[in-house]
Amino acid sequence: MPQTSAWQLNDTTARPPPPPPPPGSEAGGSDGASMNGANTLPRVSKRVSAAGKTSNIPRFKRPHLPHSTRPLSAVLTSSSSPVVHRKISPSSSAPSTSSAHRRFSHLPQQHFHHHIHHNQTAVISEETLTTPRASTLNLNQTSVFPTAISQGSMPNSGTNTAEASMTSSVCAMETEGTNGDELAESRDMVSEMQRRCRIGPSGYPHLLKAKRLRFYRNGDQYFKGIQYALQSDRVKSMQPLMEDLMKTVICDSTALPHGIRHIFTIDGAQRITSVDQFEDGGGYVCSSTDAFKPVDYSRAAEPSWRLTLANRYNRHLETKKLALSVVEPCHENTDFVFPRIIKVIRNGVKPRRISRHLLNKKTARSFDQVLRDLTFVVKLDSGAIRKLFTLSGRPVLSLQDFFRDDDVFVAYGGNEKMAADDLLVASEEHKSVGSGTSSNMRRTSRRSTMPNRNESLRHDRSGSVIPDQDQQRLPPLLDEKFQLVRLIGDGNTAVVYEVIDKTNNDDRKAMKVIARENVIGKEHLIEMELAILQKIDHTFIVQLYDHWFVDDSYYLSLELIEMGDLFEHLRIVRRVPERDAVRMMTCLGQALEYIHELGIVHRDVKLENLLIVKDEFGELGVKLADFGLAAEMPKDFGVLSTICGTPTYVAPEVLNKTGYGCKVDIWAAGVILYAILVGFPPFQSSDGSEQDLFSAIMSGEFSFPSPSWDDVSWSVRHLIMCLIHTDPFHRYSAGELLNDEWMVNLGDVDPEYEEWAHRFVQSKMHVEEEQETPYEYYTSRRTSMDELSESAAVEFSYSCES
């Protein structure tokens, strides 16, 4: 009877050699775990020290043997006695009476001539028992690797030797009377085990080839990418991979402000969710958000073609006179770069198109980059922009010229010549260019030309809308229904009148008029505002009653709020008590929670757009107004990218152009809460410069200076820090704002919570707060409202799609 084959998995990690099995144990294999083709993980056994104490620390010591003396990993023999495989090392000092020596001593010496010299005895050293072999597979069956053995040089055909894995040893014993079916079954089982254990013909595990990948930054067309070798046996999930990539140069603070949270294929067609999806040699894009920015990443590492110039002062030469050459990417000094908005006038027939472009550390890395970006934005008929001049006639020759006093430029193509008339701004263009441009084309003092109120950053919706006295009348269709009372407000895009509704018991309402000069080409923006206003109906949002489109102008009938806005109220009272601030923030929080649940972002939450109301008990509240910049979030869970808002209240993710969502309204709410408590905003600039203001906003660093904040609770300071957080993922939502301890308890929190908030705020503040001198305190109080009205709020109405 042929012996029954059995797979035995014996744990040999740091164990002494087992005693010889009793006769007949080959067939049963009762003391081993049955494999049945499964790739069972080995157990780590406890080892016994010399002192007899048990240790749970596994011994994984790999012997340092030269390649020529590596031991055999598997032995196939025709001996009738079972063979338990152990690594064999040439050691004359090992005892020859060991059990392993007795088992291998009967084999001919030439069987080991590749691994053991003829003058040495084949023994098993005790040191070799500490090899990283996890298990021993004993196969009592006929020749296991006939193909591999037949190709080797075996002096004795009766005994065949082959190498197996270093993590598992396979031994076979040929028996008489073995039929073909059992032999085929044994070979199938061994082949399956080979595949699962990755046993190669050399006896060592296959080294899994690492996948060579290249990773890019989302939206960064100038980053060449980095090479990364992905070893699937070491990195088995996406989280460790992202953490490893975060340690490399790819994690740029501007391109990836929130780290790596998503990885896309290079074309953006697929988001990678498993390491198995990576393909060798492929390119992938790392992103902080789920919005993929389509850029030709594969060409980022290629040299760029540009005009060969003898020096930087002949860029105005005609294109045909210049040759093309390949240049390496230039690394210009950008220490002077700060976030600012420039206006570029497209040369041509007046009135000319005026584009606005944001410059920051990301978009102004070199002069050539700015020219390429402006070419895409301005879209000259003659092609690329080759020349730029300020309104004073000074040519723009370097990157630093964009960050001087002038912020209005005229763009020309290669074949266009500058004329003196080109530098004169027409009356139709003057409003779009901004108040910084005067008739003599020189900017006057920034503080003397800034508006008295914060103006929003809007896109091509500016223009003079204040009508003459003779024109302050409604069209005949509306004149029959409404009677004009007085002008109560004006802005960039509209004027607001108080009217009497003749058809409804002489109710007083507000009439918002958007003049025709602001309608042409902007109908979709106004229609979006109307569509949003028709969707919403909330107690703390100004209600839209009706609207008309007459004589190319829009007329909106709105709820009238007679007490004015919070900005004017703060100019009078200077600061608001905490109890009143709680009620105002509750009104604002409920309004924001309502519109955010509808997927609507206001994008222009500020003091001027919060109208003061009183309830029947005389308590103050606010209503949210002016949805001129409001937008609906994309249905595919994307983000918005249009740069808009008011400088004092704009969130850092808007300036960084990384995409944003509803949390920009929460940031603005935090700025408002800070301002109403002490009378000045958290981010301000001493000289009204855009550089200081935007730098402070993007850093997110602010303080609670004394003595202005001495009488303000620590719990509300904690709330402000949760609202004004540079990371929108860690910033409060509208619901969290309403559920804050300070809000729920109407400013009267428990002493324990107040103490906890005190410790929290002090631990999180970036810089030690300095005590204000009496003069500094006086000037901060005296100019606090000037900061609100003038701090970087020059009418740089802009909006640019990324």
From Swiss-Prot:
SMART domains attached to this UniProt entry: DCX, S_TKc
Protein name from the UniProt record: Serine/threonine-protein kinase zyg-8
Keywords: ATP-binding, Cell cycle, Cytoplasm, Cytoskeleton, Developmental protein, Kinase, Nucleotide-binding, Repeat, Serine/threonine-protein kinase, Transferase
Pfam families (alphabetical): DCX, Pkinase
Residue ranges constituting the Protein kinase domain according to the UniProt record: 482-743
UniProt keyword Nucleotide-binding present: yes
GO cellular component: centrosome; cytoplasm; meiotic spindle; microtubule cytoskeleton; mitotic spindle microtubule; mitotic spindle pole; nucleus
PANTHER family with a match to the protein in the record: SERINE/THREONINE-PROTEIN KINASE
Main location: cytoplasm
Molecular functions per Gene Ontology: ATP binding; microtubule binding; protein kinase activity; protein serine kinase activity; protein serine/threonine kinase activity
Description of the deletion phenotype: Maternal-effect embryonic lethal resulting in dramatic spindle positioning defects in one-cell stage embryos.
Subunit (UniProt): Interacts with tac-1.
Biological process according to GO: establishment of mitotic spindle localization; intracellular signal transduction; microtubule-based process; mitotic DNA damage checkpoint signaling; negative regulation of microtubule depolymerization; thermosensory behavior; thermotaxis
Species: Caenorhabditis elegans
Classification via CDD domains: DCX1, DCX2, STKc_DCKL
Catalytic reaction list: L-seryl-[protein] + ATP = O-phospho-L-seryl-[protein] + ADP + H(+); L-threonyl-[protein] + ATP = O-phospho-L-threonyl-[protein] + ADP + H(+)
